[in-house]
């Protein structure tokens, strides 16, 4: 019987949701956040003509950018001309989640995971995976 209780407690701990965080928008109306590693940073904004976009940059081992619009699959850019990552003072702590508009993200020690409901990406030092 004790074994069953321990198994149930273990399953409950896996189902525990991440702590949700909110970030205040800048004077320009966009939201920026940076992972604790200072290797990944994101900007959420309403891009004129394209709608809502979440743009996340990874610095190392090679600079790249992922852009996820409110609809559709993410796009990965490996030749970024305006590399500007990771100056935000909003830290997206590990074990937390964030949601704004159609986007939701989770911060873990193994990287960043974001989606727009149908499509998304994971981003870390090892690479980027889109779906």
What are these regions (language model features)?
Residues 5-15:
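Bacterial N-terminal signal peptides
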Residues 16-20:
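Sec/Tat signal peptide C-region and signal peptidase I cleavage site
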Residues 21-25, 49-94, 124-131:
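A low-complexity, Ser/Thr/Gly/Pro-enriched, surface-exposed linker/loop concept
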Residues 28-44, 93-100, 104-106:
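Extracellular glycan-recognition/adhesion modules and their associated mucin-like linkers
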Residues 40, 54, 83-84, 103, ...:
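Extracellular secreted precursors and ectodomains with disulfide-bonded cysteine-rich loops/domains
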Residues 44, 58, 87-88, 107, ...:
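Disulfide-rich extracellular modules and peptides
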């Amino acid at each position: 019987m004790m074994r069953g209780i321990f198994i149930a407690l273990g399953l409950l701990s896996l189902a525990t949701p991440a702590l949700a965080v909110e970030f205040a928008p800048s004077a320009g109306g966009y939201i920026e956040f940076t992972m604790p590693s200072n290797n990944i940073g994101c900007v959420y904004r309403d891009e004129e003509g394209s709608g809502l976009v979440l743009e996340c940059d990874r610095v190392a081992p090679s600079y790249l950018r992922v852009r996820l619009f409110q609809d559709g699959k993410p796009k990965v850019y490996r030749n970024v001309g305006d590399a500007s990552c990771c100056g935000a003072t909003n830290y997206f702590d590990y074990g937390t989640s964030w949601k704004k508009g159609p986007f939701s993200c989770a911060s873990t020690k193994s990287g960043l995971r974001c989606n727009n409901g149908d499509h998304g990406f994971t981003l870390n030092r090892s690479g980027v995976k889109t779906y």
